[in-house]
From Swiss-Prot:
DNA-binding feature ranges: 108-167
Keyword Transmembrane helix: no
Annotated localization: Nucleus
Organism of provenance: Pan troglodytes
Family, per entry: Belongs to the ANF homeobox family.
Gene that this sequence comes from: HESX1
GO molecular function terms listed in the Swiss-Prot or TrEMBL record: chromatin binding; DNA binding; DNA-binding transcription repressor activity, RNA polymerase II-specific; protein homodimerization activity; RNA polymerase II cis-regulatory region sequence-specific DNA binding
Keyword DNA-binding: yes
Official protein name in the record: Homeobox expressed in ES cells 1
Complex and partners: Can form heterodimers with PROP1 in binding to DNA. Interacts with TLE1.
Record Pfam families: Homeodomain
Amino acid sequence: MSPSLQEGAQLGESKPSTCSFSIERILGLDQNKDCVPLMKPHRPWADTCSSSGKDGNLCLHVPNPPSGISFPSVVDHPMPEERALKYENYFSASERLSLKRELSWYRGRRPRTAFTQNQIEVLENVFRVNCYPGIDIREDLAQKLNLEEDRIQIWFQNRRAKLKRSHRESQFLMAKKNFNTNLLE
């Protein structure tokens, strides 16, 4: 084997150096799995275990079961959905709802905002004037309507999507009407 090939083979056998810009480093694959994540998702509507000292992870609060029924310990292990559903007959409806909300599939979902009729009227009036309000208008609306600014931003996004959908449907109906009248002639 030539000297240059031997050097290449030796380089391939050597342990790769750790670069700050390697794929493993960027993706965090070179770290322990027990490391605390640098960023936690912002979910103010979810309860955290601040008192348990478990890095602020979401807790699963399970009520005491009726006598004679034993459950696996849930203090150290999160309860999977299948296991929780197996025991759902032993809990009241409100306890089951609370349990469902605390399961992992529900953690990331924010509760739906129920707008009052007054709030909807004000938002619709503003939408008629400006369907793309700036941050200053949204913040004023949030203060006046006692809502969060991000809820107002989402409302306007949804309202624009509704307008676009209705416009598309009306265009389709007009085209369909024209097509039908042309066929009858």
